[in-house]
Amino acid sequence: MAENDVDNELLDYEDDEVETAAGGDGAEAPAKKDVKGSYVSIHSSGFRDFLLKPELLRAIVDCGFEHPSEVQHECIPQAILGMDVLCQAKSGMGKTAVFVLATLQQLEPVTGQVSVLVMCHTRELAFQISKEYERFSKYMPSVKVAVFFGGLSIKKDEEVLKKNCPHIVVGTPGRILALARNKSLNLKHIKHFILDECDKMLEQLDMRRDVQEIFRMTPHEKQVMMFSATLSKEIRPVCRKFMQDPMEIFVDDETKLTLHGLQQYYVKLKDNEKNRKLFDLLDVLEFNQVVIFVKSVQRCIALAQLLVEQNFPAIAIHRGMPQEERLSRYQQFKDFQRRILVATNLFGRGMDIERVNIAFNYDMPEDSDTYLHRVARAGRFGTKGLAITFVSDENDAKILNDVQDRFEVNISELPDEIDISSYIEQTR
């Protein structure tokens, strides 16, 4: 797959509107108390110690959270004081909840004014972050949240801004910029500017330009927060240019970004043997939900169809389908209506489904970053999971070696039998 195609696949980034949205890293799935790990329930303090609004604490209790994760423990006390934050922490650690709770805590809603702007690089992620805001603002009825991204009519967005102006806007840079340029979206009252999966937006020059133009439309005095699972040393200075003396938090070194509780294996086979092997594994493995990653839209459609024909309850998500259809299918999978999802990289970054406990790389990801974000779909927030990667040629083997070197992890060949308790939580 050409590099250009990969970018299109990942970002679905279009020239006329920068319409991409980043991912909620999921303040979902409460930590299981019996799981040992560096970040699960390691702090005896609860969310109450942050002195959050009672309305927020009620929503947190409703979501089933008791103890903040390490990244939440490190970031929230400073973030709620309005400090700029630059944070890297591995997938599944609840980064989304940091900025959602910090901005809701500080928000003083003013009718007709947008106070919070959150941008991310994929539409699905924008949608998910907006849902997190709705979840945590459950007992704050005056707070309005809206999500704007390309692929849907801009007229509807303009209508929302005119008739029911939100206090919190989540969106992708292209659509946000289009709305700001045509004066539908007024950014003069922004108090909190957040980039989620910031490296994806700032590494690409065209998207970075859009973010910079939007940034210049906001007031000088504001809080800036940026989050990502991967922040290279090269991109950090770029992030800092947007900030004033930020608090920098890097939870776990880059080489330790692999996930606690996630079993990782590979299977060596020919390309034409993948289907049979996949069906065999789906037959013998125990799973709640599974995500299968493929490299193209065509393979995504064909494999999903094949799985259904073999009586596996599969659903596909890819960039070739209309936006409404994509979001509807994402919601179906999240609501457990289907247990198997076949997806392109479009789904790979930041999307949070807490029941997924197995991720398959049917096709090898193009680099170690993509590998991390794909396998992070299983084993979210300290729960157990299994990642199985199909290796069918020398290039696949090279990428797998890169992954092992970079993250200092040993990925071994899939054994004939796997202990079920190593990749699925046992119900008590």
Curated annotation (Swiss-Prot):
Any GO MF annotation of the entry: RNA helicase activity
Function: Involved in nuclear export of spliced and unspliced mRNA. Component of the TREX complex which is thought to couple mRNA transcription, processing and nuclear export, and specifically associates with spliced mRNA and not with unspliced pre-mRNA. The TREX complex is recruited to spliced mRNAs by a transcription-independent mechanism, binds to mRNA upstream of the exon-junction complex (EJC) and is recruited in a splicing- and cap-dependent manner to a region near the 5' end of the mRNA where it functions in mRNA export to the cytoplasm via the TAP/NXF1 pathway. Splice factor that is required for the first ATP-dependent step in spliceosome assembly and for the interaction of U2 snRNP with the branchpoint. Has both RNA-stimulated ATP binding/hydrolysis activity and ATP-dependent RNA unwinding activity. Even with the stimulation of RNA, the ATPase activity is weak. Can only hydrolyze ATP but not other NTPs. The RNA stimulation of ATPase activity does not have a strong preference for the sequence and length of the RNA. However, ssRNA stimulates the ATPase activity much more strongly than dsRNA.
Residue span(s) of domain Helicase ATP-binding: 76-249
Enzyme class: hydrolase
Modified sites of kind N-acetylalanine: 2
Covalent link location (Glycyl lysine isopeptide (Lys-Gly) (interchain with G-Cter in SUMO2)): 36
PROSITE patterns: HELICASE_ATP_BIND_1, HELICASE_CTER, Q_MOTIF
UniProt motif DECD box: location: 196-199
Sites of Phosphoserine modification: 38, 41
Motif Q motif boundaries: 45-73
Reaction it catalyzes: ATP + H2O = ADP + phosphate + H(+)
Pfam families assigned: DEAD (PF00270), Helicase_C (PF00271)
Positions with biased composition (Acidic residues): 1-19
BP GO terms, sorted: mRNA export from nucleus; mRNA splicing, via spliceosome; spliceosomal complex assembly
Compartment(s) of residence: Nucleus; Nucleus speckle; Cytoplasm
The protein's name in its UniProt record: Spliceosome RNA helicase DDX39B
Keyword Ribosomal protein: no
Enzyme Commission no: 3.6.4.13
Species of origin: Bos taurus
Family: Belongs to the DEAD box helicase family. DECD subfamily.
Gene Ontology CC, one term: spliceosomal complex
Location of region: Disordered: 1-31
InterPro entries documented for this protein: DEAD/DEAH_box_helicase_dom, Helicase_ATP-bd, Helicase_C-like, P-loop_NTPase, RNA_helicase_DEAD_Q_motif
Main location: nucleus
